[in-house]
């Protein structure tokens, strides 16, 4: 009764981008097959697609090399972006003042598994 689903993860840490902007992209590919996600990411107009696309290819390579799974049968099971440390910088302003600039980072996690009902 127990199903043996091998889930393979890939994590990109300290990506210099807001997690909110990355989540907008991840929400579009969660639950899709590997090929569908590749096509969608190629044509999305957001800057966040670049690290997500790299990470998706890495997760597929991990699944193929470490678990012996076929790329054509992979499905994205988990996709989330956690907040990383915030780099704090200062912007000099008039009359000796300085404004704080926050440069957010995020940790992106993608998990793929073989599709149970592969065609």
Swiss-Prot record:
Domain of life: Bacteria
One CC-aspect GO term: cytosolic large ribosomal subunit
Alphabetical UniProt keywords: Ribonucleoprotein, Ribosomal protein, RNA-binding, rRNA-binding
Any Pfam family hit: Ribosomal_L22
The protein's name: Large ribosomal subunit protein uL22
Upper classification of the organism: Bacteria, Bacillati, Cyanobacteriota, Cyanophyceae, Nostocales
SUPFAM superfamilies with a match to the protein in the record: Ribosomal protein L22
InterPro entries given in the database record: Ribosomal_uL22, Ribosomal_uL22_bac/chlpt-type, Ribosomal_uL22_bac/org-type, Ribosomal_uL22_CS, Ribosomal_uL22_sf
Family membership: Belongs to the universal ribosomal protein uL22 family.
Assembly: Part of the 50S ribosomal subunit.
Gene designation per UniProt: rplV
Molecular function via GO: rRNA binding; structural constituent of ribosome
CDD domains: Ribosomal_L22
Biological processes per GO annotation: translation
Job description of the protein: This protein binds specifically to 23S rRNA; its binding is stimulated by other ribosomal proteins, e.g. L4, L17, and L20. It is important during the early stages of 50S assembly. It makes multiple contacts with different domains of the 23S rRNA in the assembled 50S subunit and ribosome.
């Amino acid at each position: 009764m127990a199903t043996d689903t091998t889930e393979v993860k890939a994590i990109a840490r300290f990506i210099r981008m807001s997690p909110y902007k990355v989540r907008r992209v991840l929400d579009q590919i969660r639950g899709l097959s590997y090929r569908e996600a590749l096509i969608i990411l190629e044509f999305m107009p957001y800057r966040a697609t670049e690290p997500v696309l790299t990470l998706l290819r890495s997760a597929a390579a991990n699944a193929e090399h470490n678990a012996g799974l076929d790329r054509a049968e992979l499905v994205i099971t988990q996709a989330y972006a956690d907040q990383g440390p915030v780099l704090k910088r200062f912007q000099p302003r008039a009359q000796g003042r300085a404004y704080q600039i926050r440069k957010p980072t995020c940790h992106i996690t993608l998990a793929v598994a073989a599709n149970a009902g592969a065609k």
